[in-house]
Amino acid sequence: MPPEADGPQVLIAGAGPVGLTLAHELTRRRVRVRVIDRADGPATTSRALAVHPRTLEACHQMGLADALVARGRPVVHFTVHLRGRQLIRFDTNYGRLPTAYPFSLMLDQVRTEEILRERLAGLGVGIEWGVELADCAPCGDRVNAELRRDGRSEQVTVPWLVGADGSRSTVRERLGLRLVGDATQTWLNADVVLDADLSRDSNHLVHTGSGTVLLVPFPDPGKWRAVDTGYAGQGADPETVRRRLAGSLARGLGRPVAVSEPTWVSVFRVQQRMITAMRSGRCFVAGDAAHVHSPASGQGMNTGMQDAYNLAWKLADVVRGHAREELLDTYAAERIPVGGRLLSSTRTATALVALRNAVAPVAMPVGLSFLKAVRPLKRRVEHRIMAGMSGLALHYADSPLTYGTGDGAAGVHPGHLVACTEQDVARHPGLRALRQALTDPRWLLLLFADDGGAAELALRYGRAVQIRTVIPHEDEDGPALADPDDALRQTLGVPPGGWALIRPDGYLAAKGQRSGTTTLTARLQALHLLPEDTAPGAGDSAGRPAPDGTRRGVTTE
């Protein structure tokens, strides 16, 4: 049977951070969604803890970052301990990197999900708990799915399906997609209260003699996540875990440590697996359904949310008739390489965190003392740590949506994130205006000179592309961006009179010298965008009027 005319356009299986991010971004772009989850209700255990700068930049565009930061704890250091000695304290303040969030935010997943659910509720979207996706099959221009609730079965047909249903994904299984990789060490997570006199703006790696314990601070006073990498099946009941952690931390810190009984314990195999395809027909997978990682670098939830953020704008553009379906092929083309690079980096991080080497207790003090003494070398190591952990080094330079390499050119290179430090945003009006413009869910085309073509482009592409002229003075009554000190143009590395095209997720797609409307139109079409006169429908994909009431193609601010 065909999908219902006014039914959901996208069915999302899974109401964790990935599914909620996807639902939020699709709804923000006026795509109708239905969100289901097999669980009876929201999770109550902490699970993922870190939200890194790249994810916070995305959350700023979503309008969520302030709420997350208000509830979380910033961490800007990484400290290593052995036998009562503090061997080294790495500075992981990301202030030298292009971000307004120069820290990793410690906020347990329960609260992250709460914030996303609250915002979704404000957009009129609820979660259907206790509803399991039992089966699914892509069928041409639709997806047939079987849902189960309280033993009853419901057959549904939807235009699109996304599996954000975790590492045991039903969607992945039904599509015949396999996670490939390995599972090696067994670790233990425990949420505990410590009396240990440790700085709470730092993560702490404590070498215990037989392994390591990684300590990550919660926002709550005295509460820590303890990751025991030396666990070997000694028992996972609360009292056994408490005694083991107290003994291990006392050996590593060289002093008694009071440890509470844990409020949550999880024993798990460290997995490093991913799939080689993220789409089958009109079905997609994202997050843990597509890749599972070691928790050593705290990237799992962040990568999943960024999967969802990448997919959402592309799917919305296609569903609403603003782009050809070929745009969706770029989801896997961009995100699979990211997953592969992350597997490689987390293998390294896992080895460094676990330190399962007989010579580590001897080699660590020598190596880290040398590193601490050679300041330029220490700064290089810190920069590498920050680039990897922050997510800001992630780029799409090889994407089909990226034009030009930017080799040797100044400013942001095509395929790289457009972001600025908080200080630069405060100092330069043009960068402040850019930051605000990036909260619009459309593409952003900046024209650093207007030869009269902006209005024509807006009429043809304004529903999908925010088109803004950049001028050297304030434009109180108009939509132009003011760049009085030329900082915006120089930051982007755009030639005088040129242009820059920024994707809805904040990455620079292309830039160049202005050579008329024809060139820009060709570039937009090469990115699979459809002009209004060829788009299948004036509003959404069903041909209804635009729900915001705007006239066709007219850019709104």
From Swiss-Prot:
Effect of inactivating the gene: Cells lacking this gene are unable to produce the tetracycline intermediate anhydrotetracycline (ATC).
Keywords: Antibiotic biosynthesis, FAD, Flavoprotein, Monooxygenase, NADP, Oxidoreductase
Domain of life the protein comes from: Bacteria
Molecular function GO labels: FAD binding; oxidoreductase activity, acting on paired donors, with incorporation or reduction of molecular oxygen, NAD(P)H as one donor, and incorporation of one atom of oxygen
Pathway note: Antibiotic biosynthesis; oxytetracycline biosynthesis
EC class: oxidoreductase
Keyword Oxidoreductase: yes
Catalyses which reaction(s): 6-methylpretetramide + NADPH + O2 + 2 H(+) = 4-hydroxy-6-methylpretetramide + NADP(+) + H2O; 4-hydroxy-6-methylpretetramide + NADPH + O2 = 4-dedimethylamino-4-oxo-anhydrotetracycline + NADP(+) + H2O
Family, per entry: Belongs to the PheA/TfdB FAD monooxygenase family.
Record-given protein name: 6-methylpretetramide 4-monooxygenase
Organism: Streptomyces rimosus
Gene: oxyL
